[in-house]
Amino acid sequence: MDAIVKNFPLLDDTSGRPTQKEAEEAVRVLLRWAGEDPTREGLKDTPARVIKSYREIFGGYDLVAEDVLGRTFEEVSGYDDIVLEKDVPFYSHCEHHMVPIIGKAHVAYLPNGRVLGLSKIARVVDIYARRLQTQEAMTAQIARAIDETLAPRGVAVMIEAEHLCMAMRGIKKHGSTTLTTTFTGAFKTEPAEQARFMTLLRGFK
C-alpha cells in the first residue's frame, strides 16, 4: 500500500499544464465526438462551465494535506483515547473512467501527546477526494498523511463508497458498495484496538 501512495504523481504549475483555452477546446472536441454541435445555443458556454466545475472538483491537486494537518493541539486534560470522526461524506472520481465515486470515510487515531482539530480530518478527506482516485489509494493516502504528520499511536481509516463506473456502465450493478481499510500502529498490531474501532462504527449505525 505504501507503494500506491509514494508513486502517486502530481502535476505542478511548471510541468506543462494546459491553459484554460486549451482545456475548453478539449471539451468541444469531446462534444463533437459524442455527436453534438458545441456551437448550438445550449452548449456554447458548456466548455467554460465544465472547466470551472473541474477546477473545483479536482482542486485537491493544488492542496497539500500536510499543510492542513500542520497545526495540532496539546491534549485537553490528558485525553489519550481513541478519536473517531465517522461518516465524513465525500465525492471523488474514478481514475479509470472519470465518473463519480460517492462515499463516506471513517477516520480514527490514538493520540500520542497531540490532537487535531476535528475539521482537519474532514479537510484531509476532501483533499484526496478531489483528485482522480482509486478507493484503495485514497484510503492509504488519508492514513499516511495523518500518521506521518501527527505521529499518533495508530491510525484507522475505513471508506465505504459506491462507484458509478459499476452502476452507470459495464455490469450496471447499482447500489453495490466497496469497503476498504488501512490500519497503522496499534490499530495494525493490536487486534483489540482494531476490533474496538470496528465496534464503535457498528455502535453508531
UniProtKB/Swiss-Prot annotation:
Known catalytic reactions: GTP + H2O = 7,8-dihydroneopterin 3'-triphosphate + formate + H(+)
Annotated Zn(2+) binding sites: 94, 97, 165
Gene Ontology, cellular component aspect: cytoplasm
A Pfam family of this chain: GTP_cyclohydroI
Pathway where it operates: Cofactor biosynthesis; 7,8-dihydroneopterin triphosphate biosynthesis; 7,8-dihydroneopterin triphosphate from GTP: step 1/1
Any Gene Ontology biological process: one-carbon metabolic process
GO molecular function: GTP binding; GTP cyclohydrolase I activity; zinc ion binding
UniProt entry tagged with the keyword Chaperone: no
EC number: 3.5.4.16
InterPro entries for the chain: GTP-CH-I_C/QueF (IPR043133), GTP-CH-I_N (IPR043134), GTP_CycHdrlase_I (IPR001474), GTP_CycHdrlase_I_CS (IPR018234), GTP_CycHdrlase_I_dom (IPR020602)
Key words of the record: GTP-binding, Hydrolase, Metal-binding, Nucleotide-binding, One-carbon metabolism, Zinc
Subunit composition and interactions: Homomer.
The family this protein is said to belong to: Belongs to the GTP cyclohydrolase I family.
Name of the protein in its database record: GTP cyclohydrolase 1
Taxonomic lineage of the native organism: Bacteria, Pseudomonadati, Pseudomonadota, Alphaproteobacteria, Hyphomicrobiales
